A protein has these predicted regions:
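Interdomain motor-coupling "hinge/lid" segment immediately C-terminal to the ATP-binding subdomain
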Residues: 18-127
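Short, polar loop motifs at secondary-structure junctions
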Residues: 20-22, 283-290
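Arginine/glycine-rich "motif VI" loop of SF2 helicases in the C-terminal RecA-like domain
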Residues: 218-219, 268-278
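Mg2+/Mn2+-dependent nuclease catalytic core
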Residues: 255-272
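Domain-level recognition of nuclease-like catalytic cores that cleave nucleotide substrates
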Residues: 286-313
């Protein structure tokens, strides 16, 4: 192989392509120790800003665009593409080429129903038994399907944070899609009014924020050190980011108007777990303004949050 002839010369070969399970398996088996793998997720907001005439400037506009049109390169760079037609082709290719040929996923119809059901439960704690019951399939089948979606970067499972917090913590992950546009396509959301006023509005904005967080880590070559928290006595924190043994707490709210009420979960967490090393908390919202809400919690714009993530590493 050419790569073996001059091992001292690094970075001579760059291979790109969509997620091909078989190709990745062969590469890691034959080139172990000789390759670096970069995971390229759908475009982040920061990447979309480099596209001329992207049509979005504020956090509100980027959320609308990401939800209704998605973040895959083709639909972002070429706005004339019918995104619904593109998603239909994307799913057909993904199902028929990448999955049917490589995995025994069983009924394609059941798997498509599973995708739609999972999309309707984005930003929720993953309950495989409930999904299996609703679909009439075995729990192990759902586990297998989830693993496939995770391996192909369709979904991201956000683990719970329960280190040193005792046993009364929810320990199942929450499920997020790495492209919010795919969620909207799967559940049939096609216009702004239904997006912002429908029952999934808050979940979709949370999905948008978590997916942007995951992309920020991956785009810097880092594995996300991110979590959520839910206790059995009702305390919930949407996002915890850990760095150098310090926790940063975030609540995600689909609103442009913030109040002190939104600071209560973060302040309660600080009181309950005062021995932990906790940084200042933040509320991420559709507002483009940044200011202090309380001594321990600030309002942080999406733009400010993304800048903070860039500096974070």
């Amino acid at each position: 192989m050419l790569i073996d002839k001059e091992r001292s010369k690094r970075g001579r070969f760059i291979m790109t392509g969509s997620c091909q399970f078989a190709m990745m398996k062969d590469l890691t088996e034959t080139l172990a120790g000789m390759i670096g793998i970069l995971t390229l997720l759908p475009f982040s907001i920061l990447e979309k800003r480099r596209i001329p005439d992207s049509g979005a400037e504020t956090a509100y506009e980027y959320f609308i665009h990401s939800a209704l049109y998605g973040s895959f390169p083709e639909v972002c760079v070429y706005p004339e593409i019918d995104h619904k037609y593109w998603y239909s082709g994307y799913l057909s290719t993904y199902l028929e080429r990448d999955l049917r040929n490589l995995y025994n996923i069983g009924s394609l119809r059941d798997f498509q129903r599973f995708l739609q059901l999972l999309a309707s439960r984005c930003s929720q704690v993953l309950n495989m038994s409930s999904i299996a019951n609703d679909l009439g399939v075995a729990v192990n089948t759902v586990k297998n399907w989830i693993s496939i979606l995770e391996a192909s970067y369709i979904v991201y499972l956000l683990p719970p944070y329960y280190q040193n917090l005792g046993k009364r913590i929810t320990k199942s992950p929450k499920v997020y899609f790495l492209d919010t546009g795919l969620v909207c396509y799967l559940v049939g959301l096609t216009d702004r009014d239904h997006l912002l006023k429908g029952p999934m509005a808050g979940a979709l904005f949370e999905n948008h924020c978590i997916s942007e967080t995951v992309k920020a880590f991956f785009n810097q070559g880092l594995r996300p050190a991110i979590y959520y928290l839910r206790t059995h006595n009702g305390l919930e924190i949407d996002l915890l980011i850990e760095r150098e043994n310090r926790l940063y707490l975030f609540e995600i709210k689909l609103t442009k108007t913030l109040s002190l009420e939104y600071t209560k979960p973060i302040e309660r967490f600080k009181r309950m777990f005062s021995k932990l090393n906790i940084g200042k908390g933040s509320i991420i919202s559709l507002s483009d303004e940044e200011f202090s809400l309380s001594r321990d919690v600030s309002a942080q714009s999406m733009n400010g949050y993304l800048r903070w993530l860039q500096e974070f590493s």
